[in-house]
Amino acid sequence: MIEIEKVCVDFTAGRGTPTRAVDDVSLHIAAGEIFGIVGTSGAGKSTLLRTLNALTRPSQGRVNVNGVEISALDGKALRQARQRIGMIFQHFNLMHTRTVAKNVAFSLKAAGWERSKIAPRVAEILTLVGLADKANCFPVQLSGGQKQRVGIARAIANHPDVLLCDEPTSALDLETSATILALLRQINAQLGITIVLITHEMNVIKSICDRVAVMSGGKVVESGEVFDVFAHPQHAFTQQLVSHTLNLTLPERLREHLPGQLLKILFIGDSAEQPVLSEVAIKFGVAVNILHGKIEYIGERALGILVVQLTAPHNPTAVAAAVEHIRQRTAQVEVIRG
């Protein structure tokens, strides 16, 4: 579906030294998947996204969409290729002097639809995004979430194969963000549209994406299935993002002053549902104190992380045996202190 091959993007201000915004990125995005690109501001993710519809041209490398090298197109051929690629934005980009229906109709007129087919398609797509009753409203009368729904309706009205989402929830509150992500998931499942989404929030990635690429300094530093990236982050930057998302930082005071051994335990799949800690308490006679933890469900797979304290003041070898038992029954054990 989408092939990004060794893409670099350089920007030059005046006669200054070029700044490399995207640095040697290669990715394959399969048809029908929801692919996320995550990174902090300035990571290059927006620039990379814009190469997929040639709003930004690569300085080096190639971008192929549906078997066509879109990075090499211009004129009529580029306009035709872009009709198969919808895009939504952080700040909606609606025409404020036109109604909701006319905002959506505009994209169909621009694509050359017959006049008689535009109104039925507008009604159909507004029903899909839950705005059938807002067709004659103006953007100023809408909430932020409703405005983004108009943006989505406009982007998918022309039956695109690909939908590009540029920080689609960053201007919205948490509850509204969840409804927009649910709508995107519905569109992907119902229409089979490939979605490429960029965000700075790992929670968005966790909620909606099948696979993810992590960007830092213009490079993709890690990519893979979302569950695997959360469960086994390899790059230090990814580890930082995941740790911040799961919020498992232990206060330094506890790390320094609590007796016994401190462990961070990763549970995956079935192991997240087993009474491993109860087993070690009974079998080895150690005291188990849960200091921090949570179980997340990514897709339908459980990912549990616990920070625990193990103590056995009169039997130090019991703690070592308990740790070894936990290692055998869980995905990963990290000794924080002890």
From Swiss-Prot:
It is a peripheral membrane protein. ATP binds at residues 39-46. Part of the ABC transporter complex MetNIQ involved in methionine import. Responsible for energy coupling to the transport system. It comes from Salmonella typhi. It comes from the Bacteria. GO terms for molecular function: ABC-type D-methionine transporter activity; ATP binding; ATP hydrolysis activity. This is Methionine import ATP-binding protein MetN 2. SMART domains: AAA (SM00382), NIL (SM00930). InterPro entries: AAA+_ATPase (IPR003593), ABC_transporter-like_ATP-bd (IPR003439), ABC_transporter-like_CS (IPR017871), ACT-like_dom_sf (IPR045865), MetN_ABC (IPR041701), MetN_ABC_transporter-like (IPR050086), NIL_domain (IPR018449), P-loop_NTPase (IPR027417). The keyword Cell inner membrane applies. It holds the Pfam family ABC_tran. GO terms for cellular component: plasma membrane. Keywords: Amino-acid transport, ATP-binding, Cell inner membrane, Cell membrane, Membrane, Nucleotide-binding, Translocase, Transport. It catalyses: L-methionine(out) + ATP + H2O = L-methionine(in) + ADP + phosphate + H(+); D-methionine(out) + ATP + H2O = D-methionine(in) + ADP + phosphate + H(+). The complex is composed of two ATP-binding proteins (MetN), two transmembrane proteins (MetI) and a solute-binding protein (MetQ). It is found in: Cell inner membrane. Residues 2-242 form the ABC transporter domain. Its EC number is 7.4.2.11. Belongs to the ABC transporter superfamily. Methionine importer (TC 3.A.1.24) family. The keyword Membrane applies.
